[in-house]
Regions:
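Beta-strand/loop nucleic-acid-binding surfaces
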Residues: 65-77
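Basic, glycine/proline-rich low-complexity segments that contact nucleic acids
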Residues: 1-53, 78-183
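Short, structured beta-strand/loop micro-motifs enriched in basic residues and often containing a Trp
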Residues: 61-68, 86-92
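Short, flexible active-site-proximal loops enriched in glycine and acidic residues
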Residues: 51-58, 67-70
């Protein structure tokens, strides 16, 4: 678990005030935002809660025996097969370059530089829409309405992220905020 010092030094004295502290201990799950396992199909083994992020994560077992955690999109279920790489089927959970994704499809975990790992649309219920192609670039419409020009070799995952109702959760009391490590 990640150590939560929150403004205290090794003697326990406050060295930086106004930092939130405490909260329930969290085990960090290593989520793969790069999705570099190309052309090997993988099966969704389970979908899990992750205390470190707002959306759910899925454990994928690839045919060569390796396991990875990925962000779980909506409408994916245990037993579904997902693949990474170019010219694959346009199916929820598949990851491919922006140039291979048709216009109007919702995607998440979008890279900003080829091979840089997903940076855009990683929070619960979010996605961006492919709105067009411009030479070697893809036009991507963000949830804010902004249209960004991103290199077409950048990878993105098909689908909208899970847990869209996360924004409607009521904290209810001050103590629950403290459980979450917020002040």
């Amino acid at each position: 678990p990640k150590n939560s010092m929150r403004g205290r030094n090794n003697n326990g004295h406050i060295t930086s005030r106004n930092m939130s502290g405490g909260g329930h201990k969290k085990m960090y799950r290593l989520v793969d935002f790069y999705r570099k396992k190309f052309d090997v199909p993988g099966t969704v083994e389970r979908i899990e809660y992750d205390p470190n992020r707002s959306c759910y994560i899925m454990l994928i077992k690839f045919d060569d025996g390796t396991h990875f955690y990925y962000l779980a999109p909506q409408k994916i279920k245990v037993g579904d097969v997902v693949e990474n790489g170019s010219a694959k089927e346009i199916k929820v959970g598949n990851c491919m370059p922006l140039r291979d994704i048709p216009v109007g499809v919702n995607v998440h975990n979008v890279e900003l530089q080829p091979g840089g790992g997903g940076k855009i649309a990683r929070s619960a219920g979010t996605s961006v829409t492919i709105s067009g192609l411009d030479g070697n670039y893809s036009l991507v419409k963000m949830t804010s309405g902004e249209v960004r020009k991103i290199d077409s070799r950048c990878m993105a995952t098909i689908g909208v992220l899970s847990n869209p109702d996360q924004k409607n959760i009521k904290i209810g009391k001050a103590g629950r905020s403290r459980w979450l490590g917020r002040r």
